[in-house]
Regions:
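Mid-domain Rossmann-like dinucleotide-binding core that forms the NAD(H)/NADP(H) cofactor-binding site
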Residues: 15, 55-126
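Glycine-rich beta-strand-centered segment in the early N-terminal region that forms part
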Residues: 1-26
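N-terminal Rossmann-like NAD(P) cofactor-binding module of classical short-chain dehydrogenase/reductase
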Residues: 20, 125, 140-143, 165
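Short glycine/proline-centered loop/turn elements that form peptide/ligand docking sites
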Residues: 8-9, 104-115, 148-151, 171-172
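Glycine-rich phosphate-binding loop and adjacent beta-alpha segment
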Residues: 146-206
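A structural motif shared across PLP-dependent enzymes of the aminotransferase-like
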Residues: 26-39
Length: 206
């Protein structure tokens, strides 16, 4: 939307600025004519994007960005698997991982295979035809949007020193994470995304 008024201590925005962000921490109100928002949860809307395009970004794109960059510590050349690559978060995750120059394997359903390829995936696994946890290939980073495999199964395909990040909240990651980190050098991490000024603009960088 467009900023109408700002508080006395607001420094990042002024009336007339076009902004986008997340209102979930401020009582929601996206369908209202006017809404009150914390400046920490907003960013200036890029001029080359519409309001509809930017409205789709704060949760899906930020979840993917924080999962891969902040929690996953993604690096150039890593083998990255995205489980649940056909949804909003997964689609952004493919593109973000490729921006980091990683080798990306996307896991999705049959109708979404071509979509995953178009978004940049190097390899695509149709989960209706193949279970990635039963393959010999190992991954440096697994970003899990679905949470439909056990930690034992995930452990088999996670490389030594690798990271497993789940945005679907994994009980296994919560309870076994400290033990796996101490004994096997693998990190199991749950992600609760939090849109903010540090990450919202980054989601529109490319």
């Amino acid at each position: 939307g467009v900023v109408e008024q700002v508080g006395d201590e607001v420094t990042h925005f002024k009336p007339g600025d076009e902004v986008y962000g997340d209102l979930s921490g401020d009582g929601f109100g996206a369908f209202a004519t006017y809404a009150i928002a914390n400046e920490a949860r907003l960013a200036k809307k890029p001029s080359n994007l519409t309001y509809e395009e930017t409205a789709a970004l704060p949760m899906a794109a930020v979840t993917a960005l924080q999962g891969l960059r902040d929690k996953g510590e993604i690096q150039k050349g890593q083998k990255v698997l995205i489980n649940g690559a056909s949804g909003g978060v997964g689609g952004f995750a493919i593109q973000i991982a490729k921006a980091f120059e990683a080798e990306v394997t996307a896991v999705c359903s049959t109708p979404k295979v071509e979509q995953a390829k178009a978004q940049g995936a190097d390899f695509v696994i149709d989960y209706k035809q193949e279970d990635f946890t039963k393959n010999d290939k190992q991954y440096d980073l697994i970003f899990d949007v679905v949470g439909n495999h056990s930690i034992r199964a995930i452990d088999k395909v996670l490389s030594k020193g690798g990271r497993y990040v789940s945005s679907a909240f994994s009980m296994g990651a919560m309870f076994l994470g400290p033990w796996k980190a101490a004994t096997g050098g693998k990190k199991l991490i749950n992600l609760l995304a939090s849109p903010n000024q540090a990450t919202i603009p980054s989601s529109t960088a490319r």
